[in-house]
Amino acid sequence: MHTDALPLLKADEYPGGLWYYEPHTYQPYRYVLGRVGRHPLVCIGINPSTAQPGALDPTLKSVERLANANDFDSWIMFNVYPQRATDPNDMDRVPDRALCDENLRWLQAVLAQTEPTMWAAWGTLIEKRDYLPGLMREMVALTREKNIPWVTFGKRSKKGHPHHPLYLRKDSTPEPFDVENYLDSCF
């Protein structure tokens, strides 16, 4: 993957104000969706659903609520795999490497152009496809290079997976999350 030509994280006007949204039109994949700010809570889920600027799904409404309640100036939704699927069982059986590489380029852009806190929020969905933990490791490596902190909200699953945003209490607060230890112990 080339790092010398990172894309520019650009804010554009959409319903409700300024948003980060890549690609800029609805596609069968999405790399970035979020509100503009310098210190975002970057939520890492498994795959995007139908949300877009001004039309958030219930998961992203929860992400926005928790970012605001915990004093982050913004939030960005990112996913381990960028294919849109309202049902994670519909995700590709074999990952599209071009989509994965472009996803990593956009993550690098977010890391280079903001001062984020990463939120592990994929729940048990990381077990849906065998390739997801490997893709997660690639993302974690990028955050390790920049010493980016990781957090999670709520109780972890029996297997240790971080809680999905959809079912979190309104008063949830972030807790430090050792994402590398998690990956080593769970996969």
Q: At which residue positions do the language-model features occur?
A:
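Glycine/proline-rich loop-helix segments at beta-alpha junctions forming the active-site rim
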Residues: 91-187
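Short connector loops at secondary-structure junctions
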Residues: 73-91
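A short, flexible beta-alpha/helix-coil linker loop
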Residues: 47-50, 83, 125
